[in-house]
Amino acid sequence: MVIKKTTPGLMSGTMLIIATVIGGGMFSLPIAMAGIWFPGASIILTLIAIMMLLTGLMLVEVNLHYGGGASFNTFTQDLLGHKWNVVVGIAFGFVLYILTYAYISGSSAVISQTVEKYSGFYLPARLSVIIVSVLVGGIAWYSSLLVGRITTVLIIGKFVAFFATFSGLIWHVEGAKLIDSAAWALPDTQYLPYILMTLPFCIISYGFHGNVPSLVKLYGTQGVKNITRSIFIGTAFALLLYIFWLVVTMGNISRADFSPIIAKGGNIDVFVEAIGGLFTSTSMDLILTFFGNFAVASSLLAATLGLFDYIADLFHFSDDRSGRFKTALVTYLPPAVVCFILPGGFVYAIGYAGLAFTIWSVILPPFLVKAARKRFPTAVYTAPCNNMILNLVIVVGGFVYLTVVLDVFRLLPSFS
């Protein structure tokens, strides 16, 4: 009897993209965008979404030349050589490590806040870091399948809690706060000086590019429509959700009121506490707490699973208990130690992740496409990008990279 292989539906790829890009990192958006506020933030998020969509489609074009199972290491090495491959490998590892640090920081902060809020017991941030690191490391050590199942539950819980919480807030949005009218604006208010510092946060908010090889592997070279549609729908959904998120936060918390949030470090626990102050209902405040915990926990598991697999492949650790223990140690110990020393760096880490992420999600794809179009006379799929667009994306990528470097050295104006 011939068993017919089931072709994955569009939903599988779309959910992969959505689950990857939408997570705890969205908590950093209102804080990062406070300087330019809602009108400017909406425009920049839209423009960056278009650019990230194009670079994602560029990777699809390149990846399809090599078929399912090929990843960045394969086609970067083949098309651009060993030096480029080393740079991309370092950037890839850096992004995953710094995101692991960011989500350990965010998770530990939210857990500490939740425990103190509902039990009255003060859980020190550093102790919370140890608990989170050991718990997540233990789950990853036990089974990648367990990580996947727990992540699925957390993602469902995250979206249910999100819409249950913020669909009510939409009716309390004040247009005057949203446009920062004179009644709410700070004295001598300015917006343009803060544009550059928002770019790294916007870039990382559409970080699905590492999943393009997974999509190609999922659908195969014959599933081009499902691959591209998954990316289109996932990116569009993320953009709309981010704008909705900014509407309900910036429409309820004025720009002036963001200053004390930022002054406290802008970590997730501080922001969740500020939003919690908007609710008069205890049950809604509880749902918000659940959302905060679900969001960062799902992001932590998803991001660290990618790093876990990358480390195992890089160091050729075996997939038995001993090998997975080594992998877990190399994966979680370095970011946990940094987080123990600097426990409140969630927002800053998300921004710094944009430094390396820009390399392999913005700058790398056009170079790969240029090389692939010279190498291969035909293509299964051609991204909607001519040479002018490819060059423009390279320039923009270089510009974004420069802004992150300037921000590291505190040479960019920051809203506070």
UniProtKB/Swiss-Prot annotation:
Keywords: Amino-acid transport, Cell inner membrane, Cell membrane, Membrane, Transmembrane, Transmembrane helix, Transport. InterPro entries: Amino_acid_transport_2, Trp/try_permease_CS, Trp_tyr_transpt. GO terms for cellular component: plasma membrane. Disulfide bonds: none annotated. PROSITE patterns: AROMATIC_AA_PERMEASE_1 (PS00594). Belongs to the amino acid/polyamine transporter 2 family. Mtr/TnaB/TyrP permease subfamily. This is Tyrosine permease. The lineage of its organism: Bacteria, Pseudomonadati, Pseudomonadota, Gammaproteobacteria, Enterobacterales.
